[in-house]
């Protein structure tokens, strides 16, 4: 079973006490192609393209211009935000991190698909960004990432793709070309008799599910039904086929 999650806007490049070796991202040529585009953007263009403030545009202009000189960090430790904070990567054992290395992919607008220990540099390029040269990054990446997932799952015992990514990032999947079943996870809350997704709580739960998978070395969708967090529990009556629903 292979899990996908979205990358995050927020980064944390402070040093950590991780002594393992970093690995290399799978698509360096495509990353360099994208870098060549955004390096030529002015701060005004970056602000408009990425829908960010002038301050953030200035920061990312500097990041792109000095990209090769920037320090690198393992992706699982470099991203922050609600999902990654709840993965609690700093507290994972070496065995748990090594398990995720072959069972987790982080979907990124700049890097495509990252293994947890792949070395990344500080950047911001969301999948929703509309570059002048590439209007839809998810379509741009679609075949590369789908083929990469197919190739990865060929070597797994349980050939399922667990989707814990947002709609923005899971749209990179070409479901017509994906060879293996997708398991979609939904976190719902009972609000006035109706089930609704509360964004921030769902993000936290997705991160904690990755933590649960890592700590318990889970490689089968059936074992996910034991997951509970923030009051979310598996609901068989609300789940259907490959859509697993957790309700609180």
UniProtKB/Swiss-Prot annotation:
Extract one GO cellular component term from the record.
Answer: cytosol
Q: List the disulfide bonds.
A: none
Classification via InterPro entries: YaaA (IPR005583)
Extract one GO BP annotation from the record. response to hydroperoxide
HAMAP family linked: UPF0246
Family in the record: Belongs to the UPF0246 family.
By its UniProt entry, which PANTHER family does this protein fall under? PEROXIDE STRESS RESISTANCE PROTEIN YAAA, PEROXIDE STRESS RESPONSE PROTEIN YAAA
Quote the protein name from its UniProt record. UPF0246 protein A1I_02510
């Amino acid at each position: 079973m292979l899990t996908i999650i979205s990358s995050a806007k927020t980064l944390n490049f402070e040093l950590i006490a991780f002594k393992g070796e970093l690995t290399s991202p799978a698509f360096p040529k495509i990353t360099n192609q994208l870098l060549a585009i955004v390096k030529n953007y002015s701060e005004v263009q970056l602000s408009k393209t990425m829908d960010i403030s002038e301050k953030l545009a200035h920061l990312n202009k500097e990041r792109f211009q000095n990209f090769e000189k920037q320090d690198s960090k393992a992706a699982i430790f470099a991203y922050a935000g609600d999902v990654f904070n709840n993965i609690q990567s700093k507290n994972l054992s070496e065995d748990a991190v090594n398990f995720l290395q072959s069972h987790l992919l982080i979907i990124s607008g700049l890097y495509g698909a990252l293994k947890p220990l792949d070395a990344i540099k500080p950047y911001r390029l969301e999948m929703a960004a509309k570059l002048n040269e590439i209007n839809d990054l998810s379509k741009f990446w679609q075949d590369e990432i789908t083929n990469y997932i197919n190739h990865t799952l060929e070597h797994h015992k349980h050939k399922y793709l667990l989707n814990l990514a947002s709609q923005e990032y899971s749209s990179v999947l070409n479901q017509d070309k994906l060879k293996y079943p997708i398991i979609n996870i939904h976190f719902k809350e009972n609000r006035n008799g109706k089930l609704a997704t509360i964004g921030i709580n769902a993000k936290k739960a997705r991160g904690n599910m990755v933590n649960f998978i890592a700590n318990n070395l889970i490689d089968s969708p059936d074992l996910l039904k034991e997951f509970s967090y923030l009051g979310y529990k598996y609901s068989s009556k609300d789940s259907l086929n490959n859509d697993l629903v957790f309700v609180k």
